[in-house]
From Swiss-Prot:
It comes from Helicobacter pylori (strain HPAG1). Keywords: Bacterial flagellum biogenesis, Chaperone, Cytoplasm, Translation regulation. Acts as an anti-CsrA protein, binds CsrA and prevents it from repressing translation of its target genes, one of which is flagellin. Binds to flagellin and participates in the assembly of the flagellum. This is Flagellar assembly factor FliW 2. Interacts with translational regulator CsrA and flagellin(s).
Length: 129
């Protein structure tokens, strides 16, 4: 599915279109959809790994037209390592997808408000909660 990037991924501010592909119930691939860019991310469904909740800031709700949206997806960027157990997840900067309108953006959460989320957490650190 092709998405318009309304709130850019940090460090990739020049990318305005991205393609999201579901791998399975836990993993997804996010690739740039522009000819001049070869950017690819592995994403993970945070709810499959841990209890995860946060408040979406109002400006991002407006940008992504989340009010009244029926299909919203939250995913987090994962840094894949070998073996997979060494992989890390960025829980502090989730990606939000409005599947109805094909809009997406990244929100950086306030670490003071969400001290239990970090930029690099081991993928297995919450699997037994």
């Amino acid at each position: 599915m092709l998405f318009d990037v309304k709130a850019p991924i940090l460090g990739f501010e020049t990318i305005h279109k991205m393609h999201l592909q579901k791998v399975d119930e836990i993993f997804l691939r996010l690739n740039s959809a522009e000819d001049n860019s070869v950017v690819s991310f592995t994403l993970v469904n945070p709810f499959a790994l841990r209890k995860y909740e946060f408040e979406v800031p109002t400006p991002l709700k407006i940008l992504l037209e989340l009010e009244g949206a029926k299909s919203v997806l939250i995913a987090n960027i994962m840094v894949v390592q070998t073996p997979i157990e060494l992989s890390t997840v960025n829980y502090l900067a989730p990606l939000i997808f409005n599947l109805d309108k094909q809009l997406m953006g990244q929100v950086v959460l306030d670490s003071n408000k969400y001290p239990h989320y970090h930029l690099r957490e081991n993928i297995l650190s919450h699997t037994h909660e």
